[in-house]
């Protein structure tokens, strides 16, 4: 599992091989069914679970660990142990469970092992669970939308350039990063299970809110080191020049602090996705269908499947 950090920083190597070796190691030790006793072992299992789920989303596949892996089942104690999963990765363990289930259902949809109707029926149930668990975040979204409504048209389409001290006094930096992961799970639910296109109002509502709360995080504040996955997943959904320019500025600011090659690769692929969206628009190809058979969606899937970038 420590080798994954080397891949992250250098951008060289095959993280898939390291993950498979780690899975066999964890399985042989019996840690798929129960938490380890030692702190060091718990740290490695926590790391594996996070890397496995994030990598599954980056490659449009199931997590390597089966869905009955104890880390993919709700266990509030894991966020309060030593080490606490939440503090270690900036993501609540329950949100990790949501992300794992979304990855599994998305893979079933793509490989045809489950019908679209059944996958989306399960997605509705999952969405209900996610909304109930994350109800505390919805007032934040309403406040953000209210603030945007009272500002200029330009600022309503792109985040503000300055953090809000009042906002940060109400909530810790770690809480903001955890909220980013929650809304990223909502975004992936919409895009990969309900098959909403980028331009759908629901996708753009979540994307705007993610940009707003990410804009509150100063690069180098600590927990924001966990931000790449939410940031680059949301960045793909930017549609206007203002939004994309904000992404570029935020990326540059984070790169000045966290100099890992994987961020460079993710931004490079984000630019490719944006450029492809422009090409599709010029060719009059429709992006308003719920089907993932459009050239744009096929392009994104193939781009990710063939890529070597990695983050967690």
Please name every model-derived segment.
Residues 34-40, 173, 262-268:
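Acidic, Ser/Thr-rich low-complexity linear motifs
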Residues 157, 251-312:
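Intrinsically disordered, low-complexity regulatory regions with latent secondary structure
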Residues 3-107, 297, 301-304, 312:
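Acidic/serine-rich, low-complexity amphipathic helices located in mid- to C-terminal regulatory regions
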Residues 35-36, 222-226, 258-263:
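Short coil/turn motifs that N-cap or connect alpha-helices
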Residues 40-49, 122, 148-149, 265-277:
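TPR/TPR-like alpha-solenoid helical repeat scaffolds
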Residues 63-223, 233-256, 270:
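Cytosolic regulatory protein-protein interaction regions
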Residues 1-8, 24, 46-54, 182-193, ...:
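Contiguous, well-ordered alpha-helical segments that form the cores/surfaces of helical PPI scaffolds
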